A protein has these predicted regions:
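TPR/TPR-like (Sel1-like) alpha-helical repeat modules
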Residues: 150, 154-180, 193
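Structural marker of alpha-solenoid helical repeat scaffolds
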Residues: 36-40, 73, 107, 141, ...
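Canonical positions in the second alpha-helix
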Residues: 33-36, 69-70, 103-104, 137-138, ...
Length: 204
């Protein structure tokens, strides 16, 4: 997360809500963050959180305009590049999205989220081996990211690395906070059982 941000705690809270919560909850936090940025008179943060509100509402073109404005105020804001890239993915602009992820990595190379999201995109377009490298880089920066282990497990599964995938899924379960993400937890436990059965049948 951008260390140059004037609202770092709010950005982290919003990121957690987007990753593990609901769209409604994330929108509520984004609007509260926007109000606080306005009260503090932080134009770059105002544009960033306006972009987040539009992104959550799935108004991707409008969100891009706000993220571009945020970047003009703070050219070192890796999160703004990252979220612009995510909007481009939603609009089907894949090659340029990859370039924006790279720009974010260039200006903020220690921001794990960008590596995670670039890995997510690479995995989705069939570049699984490359995706694994980006997920592992994200985890080297932020070892407790359950969502990254989840995506790493999927990429390894796509590469038929069943043992590696199983280990990654088990790591997800160990990192999820007790009582939260129940639906995600059930899904992952089912995947673990499926992989264990597959490995048992193959004698691995």
């Amino acid at each position: 997360m951008s260390k140059n941000s004037g609202c770092l705690a709010l950005r982290i809270k919003l990121d957690d809500a987007i990753t593990y919560g609901t769209a409604r909850g994330a929108l509520r936090i984004a609007k509260e963050a926007l109000r606080q940025a306005e009260n503090k008179g932080l134009p770059g943060e105002i544009e960033y959180f306006k972009g987040q509100v539009e992104l959550i509402k799935e108004n991707f073109t409008s969100a891009i305009e706000h993220f571009d404005a945020a970047i003009k105020y703070n050219s070192k804001d890796g999160a703004a590049y990252n979220d612009r890239a995510l909007c481009m993915v939603e609009l089907g602009i894949i090659d340029k999205a990859l370039r924006y992820f790279d720009k974010g990595i260039e200006v903020e190379p220690d921001y794990a989220n960008i590596y995670h999201n670039k890995g997510w995109l690479l995995n989705n377009i069939g570049r699984h081996s490359e995706a694994v490298k980006y997920f592992k880089k994200a985890l080297s920066l932020e070892p407790g990211r359950a969502v990254t282990y989840d995506n790493l497990a999927d990429a390894l599964l796509n590469l038929s690395d069943y043992k590696g995938s199983l280990q990654a899924y088990k790591k997800v379960v160990s990192l999820l906070k007790p009582g939260c993400c129940k639906q995600i937890r059930r899904k992952i436990i089912a995947q673990i059982r499926s992989l264990e059965e597959k490995l048992w049948k193959s004698g691995l």
